């Protein structure tokens, strides 16, 4: 598996230890394990039993460190655990950007198509929406029309690959989403990257939510994406009923799920098997391709393809 991004910075355990020795020497000799991740923005290492080190892979993710630190300080009252920022490091040792140490959250990442607590996930989304809606716009809290050109390019690109893909079906889903009435209510608090690898399960229950750098306020549709990137036809209605949403918001949420999948699949199909498998699951749930084989669990970080992913 090659690099995901052309401008990706080389990161290894030796670099992480040097950074720790300069910033937090008390942690520098703890066991350090790279995490197999579905994320696309950070390299993530488990540090000892109770910490993780998160290092942006590209300049595009460098601003996430400060943003996520602030967001995580505003999430009191949620029904699940979120990480706590234990330290922030400065550029050093040839590494050019800020980096962070977070607390470790116990749990296994959710996996698309496997049993998932649809009702608890909906309760989390509702609880997040109930928090004060102050802060910057969420990464995906904007109108779908803002990513229309990129989605259409990605659909055309997918038709030129060997991926089983029904472009006509995808365009129909996209047209319905674009045609749905826009959100006219007050902005809502959003995570905006509720990928399975960011949802931690323990004993079959939702225990934690990771990777808050894309969070903010906006149209609540984007936090409906687990209905397609995690759940199936059997559990989607449970999620929809519990989250409580109108037809227009549901259609826009389906549009966000499609947009992410069609852009991620051609970009990551040879470099990130976790994200690629998830995109295939989404497209199958939207009747745009055959049902794929089951994926495996990986802890993720924020999912974005620089300059392409909505």
Language-model segment annotations:
Residues 41-47, 53, 85, 174-224:
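Active-site acidic catalytic loop and adjacent metal/ATP-binding pocket
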Residues 40, 214-217, 222-310:
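Helix-rich C-terminal or lid/interface subdomains of diverse kinases
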Residues 65, 117-121, 170, 258, ...:
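Hydrophobic packing residues in well-ordered alpha-helices of helical domains and bundles
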Residues 48-51, 77-81, 204, 229-233, ...:
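Short glycine/proline-enriched coil/turn segments at helix->beta-strand junctions
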Residues 6, 29-143, 150, 157-160:
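ATP-binding pocket architecture of kinase catalytic cores
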Residues 1-3:
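Short, contiguous pre-domain boundary segments
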Residues 9-30, 90-94, 114, 123-192, ...:
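An alpha-helical support segment within catalytic cores of ATP-dependent transferases
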């Amino acid at each position: 598996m090659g690099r995901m991004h052309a401008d990706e910075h080389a990161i290894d355990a030796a670099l992480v230890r040097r950074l720790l020795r300069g910033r937090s020497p008390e942690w520098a000799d703890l066991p350090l394990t790279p995490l197999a991740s579905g994320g696309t923005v950070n390299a993530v290492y488990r540090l000892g039993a109770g910490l993780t080190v998160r290092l942006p892979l590209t300049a595009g993710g460098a601003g996430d460190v400060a943003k996520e630190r602030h967001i995580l300080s505003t999430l009191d009252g949620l029904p699940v655990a979120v990480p706590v920022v234990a330290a922030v490091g400065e550029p050093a040792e040839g590494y050019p950007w800020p980096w962070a140490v977070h607390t470790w959250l116990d749990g296994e990442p959710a996996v698309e198509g496997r049993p998932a607590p649809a009702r608890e996930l909906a309760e989390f989304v509702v609880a997040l929406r109930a928090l004060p809606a102050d802060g910057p716009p969420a990464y995906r809290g904007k109108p779908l029309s803002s990513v229309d050109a990129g989605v259409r390019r990605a659909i055309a690109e997918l038709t030129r690959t060997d991926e089983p893909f029904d472009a006509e079906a995808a365009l129909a889903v996209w047209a319905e989403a674009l045609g749905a009435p826009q959100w006219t209510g007050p902005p809502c608090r959003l995570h905006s990257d509720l990928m399975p690898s960011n949802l931690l399960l323990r004993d079959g229950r939702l225990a934690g939510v990771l990777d808050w750098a894309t969070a903010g306020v906006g149209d609540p549709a984007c936090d409906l994406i687990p209905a397609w990137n995690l759940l199936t036809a059997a559990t989607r209605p449970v999620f929809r009923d519990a989250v409580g949403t109108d037809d227009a918001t549901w259609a826009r949420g389906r549009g966000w799920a499609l947009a992410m999948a069609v852009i991620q699949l051609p970009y990551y199909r040879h470099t990130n098997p976790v994200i690629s498998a998830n995109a295939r699951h989404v497209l199958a749930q939207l009747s745009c391709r055959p049902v794929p084989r089951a994926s495996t669990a990986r802890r993720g970080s924020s999912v974005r393809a620089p300059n392409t992913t909505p």
